[in-house]
Amino acid sequence: MQENQQITKKEQYNLNKLQKRLRRNVGEAIADFNMIEEGDRIMVCLSGGKDSYTMLEILRNLQQSAPINFSLVAVNLDQKQPGFPEHVLLEYLEKLGVEYKIVEENTYGIVKEKIPEGKTTCSLCSRLRRGILYRTATELGATKIALGHHRDDILQTLFLNMFYGGKMKGMPPKLMSDDGKHIVIRPLAYCREKDIQRFADAKAFPIIPCNLCGSQPNLQRQVIADMLRDWDKRYPGRIETMFSAMQNVVPSHLCDSNLFDFKGITHGSEVVNGGDLAFDREEIPLQPAGWQPEEDENQLDELRLNVVEVK
């Protein structure tokens, strides 16, 4: 009996520790990109996946202690996929007591009608979903739209654009919609997918799989995701370093004339700080930038096992 109680305390301690890390990551992203401001009404897009559940949970947690006032409204788009368990999210949100809206639109039927069998449905599905969510945000008076993309999603997008699109373009933590009417934020931008997965498992969120893309295992994004996971296992710190690189761009050392005036470099031009490496090899640090040793969740401080709630 005592052993079972001890295991429960250790599991609770680890969950609290993980939640604190996710809170810290989300809080830093919100501060760095000014994602949430006084009086904001945040429309939290809830798909039924681990990422959006985690985003809603962490935002609700932060809402209780934030120095500013903001409100949340959870929105789920029921795309009328066959077998979609409509009751799952409804029951979860009712139990949670959060304001919510379920939007019903048969985008599944449109996608199946327009996209040939075996072809990727993601592009059309995303466009349809985006339009509906923008419209819903206007109806609800939302000032920000929160999406559940995390750090790994952002890196995957960068490599997808480099490998297949010939562009150095990622997924911004904050953006303005093309029509200039909506601000989209990604509060999980600094969060690791493996942390989100562990948190979702521990909280036992009622996960709902996407039937539209679940039958497309060879998507380009999945190939990139597998590559990044392999790198993370074989070369600890590489993922952190790559994400750090996205925040430390040096236009003078790339090849885009739109970002840096290479043609304007003449005798007497202003010196670019750190730019004189024409004849030298740049020194690379022994440890990857931004890397920290993985925390050993099993090495617990016995004196702190009575922690039961994150404040």
Swiss-Prot record:
Q: What else is known?
A: The thiolation reaction likely consists of two steps: a first activation step by ATP to form an adenylated intermediate of the target base of tRNA, and a second nucleophilic substitution step of the sulfur (S) atom supplied by the hydrosulfide attached to the Fe-S cluster.
Its name, as the record gives it, is: tRNA-cytidine(32) 2-sulfurtransferase
Give the similarity note.
Belongs to the TtcA family.
PANTHER family reported in the protein's UniProt record: AMINOTRAN_5 DOMAIN-CONTAINING PROTEIN, SULFURTRANSFERASE-RELATED
Tell me a GO cellular component: cytoplasm
GO molecular function terms noted in the UniProt entry: 4 iron, 4 sulfur cluster binding; ATP binding; magnesium ion binding; sulfurtransferase activity; tRNA binding
Q: How is the cofactor bound?
A: Binds 1 [4Fe-4S] cluster per subunit. The cluster is chelated by three Cys residues, the fourth Fe has a free coordination site that may bind a sulfur atom transferred from the persulfide of IscS.
Q: Where in the cell is it found?
A: Cytoplasm
Originating species: Shigella dysenteriae serotype 1 (strain Sd197)
Q: How does it assemble?
A: Homodimer.
* EC number of the protein: 2.8.1.-
Keyword Magnesium belongs to the record: yes
Q: Where does [4Fe-4S] cluster bind?
A: C122, C125, C213
InterPro entries, per the entry: Rossmann-like_a/b/a_fold, TilS/TtcA_N, tRNA_Cyd_32_2_STrfase, tRNA_thiolation_TtcA_Ctu1
* Keywords from the UniProt entry: 4Fe-4S, ATP-binding, Cytoplasm, Iron, Iron-sulfur, Magnesium, Metal-binding, Nucleotide-binding, RNA-binding, Transferase, tRNA processing, tRNA-binding
Q: Pfam families, from UniProt?
A: ATP_bind_3
